[in-house]
Amino acid sequence: MPMKIVLRLFDWASSQVNRQRIILLVGSLALFLSARSSWYQLPPDTLEAFGVSLTIANYYRLIPILFGLLGLFFTIWQVKAKTIRLLFWSGLFIVLLFPYFQSNWTPSVTFLANNYYSQSARVDRNVERNFSDIQAQWKQNISLDEPNTPDASLNALIKNSSFLQVSSLEKFLKDVLSYDVSFFWYISLNWAIAILGFAISLFGMYLDQSHRAMNLLNRDIGNLLPWLAVVLSLLCISILVPNIIHYQLNLSYAKGDYRVVQSMSKTLATLYPPLQGDEFFLERLARAGYYNEQPDISLVALARGLENYRQKNWIKAETHFQESLNLKPKNFLVRGYLASAILNQGISNFNDPSNRNAATAADTFERVLTVFPNHMEAMYDLMLARAVNGEFDKSANIAIKIIENQKYSQRPRSALLGQAYLHLAWKGFKDHNYQKAWQRYRQSVDDSVWKTVIEEEP
């Protein structure tokens, strides 16, 4: 008797299994898998130093969890309703807008992503340009590149009317929706898995409709297009309105109406956070407050620092930036400029042809890392300076940190990683550990062995 019950249950379960249910189950599992960790990844000590939170990236993970539960429910109890399909389409579009919300509502994250990407790119160019000297260990002949000004967190200021033309679609995707390579460099694979999970789930929902599937798909897309147009229009308005007000404030500033500029700028920065990382906007606000006799001391110090920075007076610039940062520790733009001003001092010491001072330069690069942890150019420059100064153990420690930080990016920088492994090879050679030195040297020229684990002695 029990055997018959088991067989009947098995037959019933077999009859319930079909392609649609299997695909819905796979889609649900993919959605659950995408929520295993944060959708954006940056070094934790950098986030702490800048006072940055990945709240949006963490809360966004609730979306695939909810839709994964819905998918499991529909896997067991099949529901054929247009509302369900449109609900999953909406979930997919919300997930696709993750870069927009992450970039626009946490501009400090955009600032860090832009700067880490550009710093790594400049280091790569320096390595490629000096490759022959680097491989030959002629560090004394290498000059370090001056860093560019910190990249802003605001990319969507409209420069002219071409923004409204069809040809500006790429700019809309890159600057408004934040579909930019610098942002994607540090995005987690979980975001792509979530998109895949929604796509699989939607495929499963249309699968059992046989010859009606394409008709239903066309009808659903037709129902979604008006709503999609509304969403895109709202996104455009969210960019156009701040730009219109921004340029209107330029006119008010030119007329000397500083009170209006000061009050409206503060309101605009609250409603449109990316402006908090735009140096022109903040400098204008500082000057308006100063002339209105209601100065924001932190912004005035920032403006003075920017003026000295443009004149390449790095020490005075550092003083003003430090004063501004002391008053507003979470001002990420000030922190970025402060790090750049200190870095330029170290590079000047290192590049001085008549009196190269690698030890002083190294100490200066260390100061950069206390302001801007994991600053790629500062770590690379510090690694070189320590090697030039004969401090191969300290150089190797920085190399290890560079290697560890590459795990946060989607695609490690080959030139930078190659140099880090080369410095570890030199440490092994100086320690007379020739086997380890050879293994590290192989890693510096062959990316296929990067994942080989080699323990370093303390």
Write out the residue ranges for each language-model feature.
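Internal/C-terminal transmembrane anchor helices
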Residues: 90-100, 216-244
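Hydrophobic alpha-helical transmembrane segments in integral membrane proteins
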Residues: 101-114, 234-259
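Residue-level recognition of tetratricopeptide repeat
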Residues: 250, 275, 297, 306, 331, 340, 347, 375, ...
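TPR alpha-solenoid repeat register
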Residues: 277-281, 300, 334, 378, ...
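Canonical tetratricopeptide repeat
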Residues: 284, 303, 337, 344, ...
